[in-house]
């Protein structure tokens, strides 16, 4: 279901079980949903080389996106700047003053630098552009009902809605819902 002209509803989607279950719940319960947005980290944008797991991005492009579009959902794949640029980034500000002016080098695993500097920057730009076009916007997030700590931490923003929490879907229930749609 599309929202009115003043309000925009989108799902920031990782194409994991919780994100997909959120989309399916929106469709099942006639919740407004204007667009699903996936942010693809690019290794080499100029040559079209993705930085995502090849099996995942192939599944997103060739299975999930067409299936959702057949269900009437607009799916947009945003592409980040090359993540390789993070290797050459000069640190301008840091909690550790001795790092300022140095080159970051290789991103450390599990430190969220790529998520923060690539995915979140691209999504932030999308949200800023959305705010200029609509009076109100809401972002569906795939956080399950049984993820209480994460819900408390992530739902402080009044623009975010968890349909999994609204309909009391646990992670297991989200997985089962996704299985129904292959």
Where on the chain are the PLM-derived regions?
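Nucleotide-activated chemistry modules centered on ATP-dependent adenylation/adenylyltransferase
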Residues: 1-182
């Amino acid at each position: 279901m599309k929202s009115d002209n003043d309000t925009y509803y989108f799902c920031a989607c990782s194409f994991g079980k919780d994100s997909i279950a959120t989309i399916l719940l929106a469709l099942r319960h006639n919740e407004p949903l204007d667009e699903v947005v996936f942010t693809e980290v690019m290794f080499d944008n100029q040559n079209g080389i993705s930085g995502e797991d090849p099996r995942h991005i192939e599944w997103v492009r060739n299975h999930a996106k067409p299936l959702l579009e057949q269900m009437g959902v607009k799916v947009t794949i945003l592409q980040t700047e090359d993540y390789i640029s993070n290797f050459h980034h000069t640190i301008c500000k840091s909690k550790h003053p001795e790092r300022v002016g140095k080159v970051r080098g290789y991103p450390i695993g599990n430190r969220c630098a790529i998520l923060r500097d690539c995915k979140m920057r691209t999504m932030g730009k999308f949200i800023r552009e959305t705010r200029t076009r609509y009076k109100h916007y809401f972002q569906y997030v795939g956080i399950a009902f049984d993820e209480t700590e994460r819900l408390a931490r992530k739902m402080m923003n009044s623009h975010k809605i968890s349909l999994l929490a609204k309909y009391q879907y646990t992670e297991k229930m989200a997985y089962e819902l996704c299985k129904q749609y292959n």
